[in-house]
Curated annotation (Swiss-Prot):
<comment type="subunit">
    <text>Part of the 50S ribosomal subunit. Contacts protein L32.</text>
</comment>
<keyword id="KW-0689">Ribosomal protein</keyword>
<dbReference type="GO" id="GO:0006412">
    <property type="term" value="P:translation"/>
</dbReference>
<dbReference type="Pfam" id="PF01196">
    <property type="entry name" value="Ribosomal_L17"/>
</dbReference>
<comment type="similarity">
    <text>Belongs to the bacterial ribosomal protein bL17 family.</text>
</comment>
<dbReference type="InterPro" id="IPR036373">
    <property type="entry name" value="Ribosomal_bL17_sf"/>
</dbReference>
<dbReference type="InterPro" id="IPR047859">
    <property type="entry name" value="Ribosomal_bL17_CS"/>
</dbReference>
<dbReference type="GO" id="GO:0022625">
    <property type="term" value="C:cytosolic large ribosomal subunit"/>
</dbReference>
<dbReference type="InterPro" id="IPR000456">
    <property type="entry name" value="Ribosomal_bL17"/>
</dbReference>
<dbReference type="GO" id="GO:0003735">
    <property type="term" value="F:structural constituent of ribosome"/>
</dbReference>
<protein>
    <recommendedName>
        <fullName>Large ribosomal subunit protein bL17</fullName>
    </recommendedName>
</protein>
<keyword id="KW-0687">Ribonucleoprotein</keyword>
Amino acid sequence: MRHRCRVPKLGRPADQRDALIRTLTTELLRHGRISTTLARAKVIRSEADRMITLAKDGSLAARRQASGFLYDPELVQSVFAAAQERYGSRRGGYTRILRTVARRGDNSPMAIIELV
């Protein structure tokens, strides 16, 4: 039974939520840091860490799994090429969330998520 296994809904249906998480994770890995809401940053932190862990593994199965999640095939190649020397000694915690000022229109808490 999956009692108390809650998924942050982010105010969207499941298919839109999955697409949003994939898009934000792809952009985070491409640019290194993005600004988004705090709730979205907390959700994509785990997905970005999972992609970097797959890149550190470097196997063909891990590469195929990452290319099925990320939208950009060239990004998969660059992440897998740079992950071993950048995060080789680190055992997790590849991202950092910095809280910023609230958004002006609706006062939602904003954050900057960046790769360490």
